[in-house]
Amino acid sequence: MRQYLDLCQRIVDQGVWVENERTGKRCLTVINADLTYDVGNNQFPLVTTRKSFWKAAVAELLGYIRGYDNAADFRQLGTKTWDANANLNQAWLNNPYRKGEDDMGRVYGVQGRAWAKPDGGHIDQLKKIVDDLSRGVDDRGEILNFYNPGEFHMGCLRPCMYSHHFSLLGDTLYLNSTQRSCDVPLGLNFNMVQVYVFLALMAQITGKKPGLAYHKIVNAHIYQDQLELMRDVQLKREPFPAPQFHINPKIKTLQDLETWVTLDDFDVTGYQFHDPIQYPFSV
C-alpha cells in the first residue's frame, strides 16, 4: 500500500502536464513505475486509503481469462467496467466493426484466447501457458500478450495492461506484468488487484507455489479533474495494514475458471478502509 501512495505522491510532486488527445483532458504524468506484490505471503495490495471494490476487479480478470468480448458478459460476472467504453465511446460507436450494443470488439481476453493467425486459425495463448506450467515447463516465453496493433481498429480500446509474463524457478511461479498507461487514482486500484490475483490463480491451477508479482507501469498519470481529490484527500490519509485474499481451493483447472467459478469463490479478510472517493472517469 505504501508503494502505491509513494507513486501518487511522486506524480503530484514531479509530474509533467501532458495533453491527452483521446480524452481531451490534461494529465499530470511520470514515466516508469515499478510495484511488487508478495503473493506467496498473501500481502494483498488492496487500497485502504479509500474503499476499494475488489470484486469488480476480479470479475474483470475472470472475463479476460474467458475471452469475453461483450460488456453484458462482464456485467453478469459482476462488473460494469466495460459499459462506457463499449457504449459511450463515440469513435467506437461509429466503427463499422462494432457489432451492436455492449460489443467491445477484439480486445484483451479475445487476443489472449483467440489471437488471429494469418492462415485463418487462432492461437490460445493462455491455454499454452497453463499447459506448459502444469508440466513444469518454462520456455522463457510464457507470455500472455493482448497488444495486437493489427487489430486495434477492431476493438473499442487498446489494452493498457498488455503483457503478463510467467516464469518458473523450481516450483515457484513468478509474474511480470507490463502496463503502457495507467489512470492511477482509478485504474491502478484495479490493476494491482488483478496482477496479484492472476499470479495466485495461475499458481493454484498449475500446482505451483506463488512467488512475487512485478508490475511495471510506463505512463502513470493523474487527470486534472482528479488531482484535488488525490492531493488534498487521499494522500492525507494513513493506510491500514494489508488484508488477505482467499481463493476457493476447489478451483483446480483452467476449465474451472472458464465454467463454474463466480465471485463467491473469492474472499478478502482483514480489510480496513477509509471512506470512498468518487474520482471522475475518462472515457
Swiss-Prot record:
<dbReference type="GO" id="GO:0006235">
    <property type="term" value="P:dTTP biosynthetic process"/>
</dbReference>
<dbReference type="InterPro" id="IPR000398">
    <property type="entry name" value="Thymidylate_synthase"/>
</dbReference>
<feature type="binding site">
    <location>
        <position position="191"/>
    </location>
    <ligand>
        <name>dUMP</name>
    </ligand>
</feature>
<comment type="subunit">
    <text>Homodimer.</text>
</comment>
<feature type="binding site">
    <location>
        <position position="183"/>
    </location>
    <ligand>
        <name>(6R)-5,10-methylene-5,6,7,8-tetrahydrofolate</name>
    </ligand>
</feature>
<feature type="binding site">
    <location>
        <begin position="221"/>
        <end position="223"/>
    </location>
    <ligand>
        <name>dUMP</name>
    </ligand>
</feature>
<comment type="function">
    <text>Catalyzes the reductive methylation of 2'-deoxyuridine-5'-monophosphate (dUMP) to 2'-deoxythymidine-5'-monophosphate (dTMP) while utilizing 5,10-methylenetetrahydrofolate (mTHF) as the methyl donor and reductant in the reaction, yielding dihydrofolate (DHF) as a by-product. This enzymatic reaction provides an intracellular de novo source of dTMP, an essential precursor for DNA biosynthesis.</text>
</comment>
<dbReference type="GO" id="GO:0032259">
    <property type="term" value="P:methylation"/>
</dbReference>
<feature type="binding site">
    <location>
        <position position="282"/>
    </location>
    <ligand>
        <name>(6R)-5,10-methylene-5,6,7,8-tetrahydrofolate</name>
    </ligand>
</feature>
<dbReference type="GO" id="GO:0006231">
    <property type="term" value="P:dTMP biosynthetic process"/>
</dbReference>
<comment type="similarity">
    <text>Belongs to the thymidylate synthase family. Bacterial-type ThyA subfamily.</text>
</comment>
<dbReference type="GO" id="GO:0004799">
    <property type="term" value="F:thymidylate synthase activity"/>
</dbReference>
<dbReference type="InterPro" id="IPR045097">
    <property type="entry name" value="Thymidate_synth/dCMP_Mease"/>
</dbReference>
<dbReference type="InterPro" id="IPR023451">
    <property type="entry name" value="Thymidate_synth/dCMP_Mease_dom"/>
</dbReference>
<feature type="binding site">
    <location>
        <begin position="180"/>
        <end position="183"/>
    </location>
    <ligand>
        <name>dUMP</name>
    </ligand>
</feature>
<keyword id="KW-0545">Nucleotide biosynthesis</keyword>
<keyword id="KW-0963">Cytoplasm</keyword>
<dbReference type="Pfam" id="PF00303">
    <property type="entry name" value="Thymidylat_synt"/>
</dbReference>
<feature type="binding site">
    <location>
        <position position="22"/>
    </location>
    <ligand>
        <name>dUMP</name>
    </ligand>
</feature>
<dbReference type="InterPro" id="IPR036926">
    <property type="entry name" value="Thymidate_synth/dCMP_Mease_sf"/>
</dbReference>
<feature type="active site" description="Nucleophile">
    <location>
        <position position="160"/>
    </location>
</feature>
<dbReference type="GO" id="GO:0005829">
    <property type="term" value="C:cytosol"/>
</dbReference>
<comment type="pathway">
    <text>Pyrimidine metabolism; dTTP biosynthesis.</text>
</comment>
<protein>
    <recommendedName>
        <fullName>Thymidylate synthase</fullName>
        <ecNumber>2.1.1.45</ecNumber>
    </recommendedName>
</protein>
<keyword id="KW-0489">Methyltransferase</keyword>
<dbReference type="InterPro" id="IPR020940">
    <property type="entry name" value="Thymidylate_synthase_AS"/>
</dbReference>
<keyword id="KW-0808">Transferase</keyword>
